[in-house]
Amino acid sequence: PNTKSIDGENTSKDGFFTYVNGFIKEKLSLGGSAAIKITEFSWNKDLYELIQRFEYWTVFCTSVNTSSSEGFLIGVNYLGPYCDRAIVDGNIMHANYIFWRNSTIMALSHNSVLDTPKFKCRCNNALIVNLKEKELNEMVIGLLKKGKLLIRNNGKLLNFGNHLVNVP
């Protein structure tokens, strides 16, 4: 018997992922972190490719519901255009995740991704600075990779407020 109703191929979705990807590219500080929920049928090719532009990234499954395809793409220390690693195609990344998820027997757990020994995220008291693009050098990129530095994007005007209507 079928357990899921599937109406076509399982392809990359846009929807809200367009906004998540835009936020990471345009507003997330260099050195910042992100966690985005994905499932077998709710995923995005570009997001998989973007998450590889973090110094450390993984897909984390909570195992609370072992029959679920839910996972979280975790990215730590965003490098953006300063990432020098090869980027794997997002469709291949998702296929690998689904294969791994469907072939791995998981025991129930409630562990946090931050509790796992291999997770490289530590509290580092990162310094937050404004730097121009021309001021980024190998030393600065090294500090980003180690989580010692956050660089605000001071080239864009960001306007946030708590009002739904702007009144002159």
Curated annotation (Swiss-Prot):
<dbReference type="Pfam" id="PF06460">
    <property type="entry name" value="CoV_Methyltr_2"/>
</dbReference>
<dbReference type="InterPro" id="IPR009461">
    <property type="entry name" value="NSP16_CoV-like"/>
</dbReference>
<keyword id="KW-0808">Transferase</keyword>
<dbReference type="GO" id="GO:0032259">
    <property type="term" value="P:methylation"/>
</dbReference>
<comment type="function">
    <text>The replicase polyprotein of coronaviruses is a multifunctional protein: it contains the activities necessary for the transcription of negative stranded RNA, leader RNA, subgenomic mRNAs and progeny virion RNA as well as proteinases responsible for the cleavage of the polyprotein into functional products.</text>
</comment>
<keyword id="KW-0489">Methyltransferase</keyword>
<protein>
    <recommendedName>
        <fullName>Replicase polyprotein 1ab</fullName>
        <ecNumber>2.1.1.-</ecNumber>
    </recommendedName>
</protein>
<dbReference type="GO" id="GO:0004483">
    <property type="term" value="F:mRNA (nucleoside-2'-O-)-methyltransferase activity"/>
</dbReference>
<dbReference type="InterPro" id="IPR046438">
    <property type="entry name" value="NIV_2_O_MTASE"/>
</dbReference>
<dbReference type="InterPro" id="IPR029063">
    <property type="entry name" value="SAM-dependent_MTases_sf"/>
</dbReference>
<feature type="domain" description="Nidovirus-type SAM-dependent 2'-O-MTase">
    <location>
        <begin position="1"/>
        <end position="165"/>
    </location>
</feature>
<dbReference type="GO" id="GO:0075523">
    <property type="term" value="P:viral translational frameshifting"/>
</dbReference>
